[in-house]
Amino acid sequence: MKRPFLTLFSALVLASALVPTTYAAVDLDNPSVKLSPDQIPSAVERLIREKKFDTALEYINEGLEQNPISAQLKFQKSVLYEAEGWPDLAQKELESFIKTFPEIPEAYNNLARYASNRGDYKRAEELLTQALALRPGYTTARENLANVYLAEAAQALKVAAKGGSRSAARRLTALEELLKD
């Protein structure tokens, strides 16, 4: 009676060994060529641009299996989640990224956008200030910080305008026009 079980078990083991691995990151233009770990980020970038999100995530995961400390792939994962329309996952990924790679300013800049979108301008300011401390010449972070200051000014002007200040109302109108860009 044990023999049929062993035969079945042996057959299953053999069958699973014959099934190819579930995924292999391959060259997008030449699928017969497997990508090396340092080629995967470029392929992921292209896949995200082409909106092939499932394949991009598979490439990221495979790349992280080969190189678990790849800052580029971990960052791309947050970019992928944002592109896919999963901002909560993107934000979690960025928070995790900052804990692992606190020296990379782009993560602070991207995370600040989420804080700003929630209206948490103080947190956005903290994150952007950190990005600028890491790289003082980071123009995008500086511009985003200026936008945070403008949004805070708009909030203050709204309160003043509701209180009856005509000059605050005029400034608010001008500022809102400026913020449309």
Regions found by a protein language model. Give the residues of each.
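Terminal, low-structured helical/coil segments at or just beyond the last alpha-helical repeat
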Residues: 25-37, 147-181
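Helix-start (N-cap) detector for alpha-helical repeat units in TPR-like alpha-solenoids
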Residues: 36-37, 71-72, 105-106, 139-140, ...
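Conserved structural position within tetratricopeptide repeats
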Residues: 64-65, 95-99, 129-133, 162
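Alpha-helical segment of the N-proximal tetratricopeptide repeat
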Residues: 38-69, 79, 83
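Structural signature of tandem alpha-helical TPR/SEL1-like repeats
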Residues: 50-58, 83-96, 118-130, 149-159
